[in-house]
């Protein structure tokens, strides 16, 4: 099985003119679906009763997708309820590149134009937390995203955690 590993970050200077909205939530629902069971004193790596798989990331993708899709939909709805913007104002959506199915959900369920949702997963795979900044930089470098564009970032993480930001680039 191919594995990907990467790291990336984007640095933004806080300016009231450009950061329009930011939100992060964590829910315990589904926490057992994305976790590393080992570590600490409970399943210490050197404990003879600890198995190798206890110290590896474990995920039930289909189950966590169902929960994350519903939570993401609510986060999208709340973003536009809590701001003066609407979906049509968004130039580009830069989502976590979890899977093609997850990316397409921003069009199907989030009701964003499919052409406005940045998709690099077919070239990079799921690079976990690095996928959002990687997708952003890719779209800037290839000329899709330009200064003045309204960008909606949204990402998920184990736990289940989710964050979004609405910025003018």
Q: How would you label these PLM feature ranges?
A:
Residues 1-8, 12:
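Single conserved hydrophobic/aromatic residue that forms the stacking wall/gate
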Residues 9, 21, 33, 164-166:
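Conserved hydrophobic/aromatic beta-strand scaffold that supports enzyme active sites
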Residues 14-18:
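Short helix-loop capping/hinge motifs at secondary-structure junctions, enriched
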Residues 19-51:
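Mobile, glycine-enriched helix-loop/loop "lid" segments at the mouths of ligand-binding/catalytic clefts
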Residues 39-91, 101-111, 135, 139, ...:
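Conserved active-site "lid/cap" helical segment
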Residues 69, 73, 91-169:
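Claisen-condensing/thiolase-fold acyl-transfer catalytic domains that form or cleave C-C bonds
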């Amino acid at each position: 099985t191919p594995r990907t590993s990467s790291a990336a970050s984007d640095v933004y200077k806080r300016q009231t003119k450009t950061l329009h909205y930011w939100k992060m939530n964590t829910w315990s629902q589904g926490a057992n679906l994305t976790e590393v069971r080992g570590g600490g004193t409970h399943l210490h790596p050197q404990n003879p009763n600890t198995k190798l798989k206890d110290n590896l990331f474990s995920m039930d993708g289909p189950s966590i997708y169902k929960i994350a899709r519903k939570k993401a939909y609510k986060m999208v709805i709340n973003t536009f309820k809590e701001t003066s913007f609407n979906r049509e104002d968004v130039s580009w959506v830069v989502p976590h590149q979890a899977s093609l199915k997850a990316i397409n959900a921003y069009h199907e369920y989030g009701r964003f134009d499919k052409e406005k949702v940045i998709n690099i997963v077919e070239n990079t795979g799921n690079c976990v937390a690095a996928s959002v900044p990687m997708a952003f930089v890719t779209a800037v470098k290839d000329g899709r995203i330009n200064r003045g564009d309204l960008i909606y970032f949204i990402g998920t993480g184990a736990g289940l955690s989710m964050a979004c930001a609405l910025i003018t680039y």
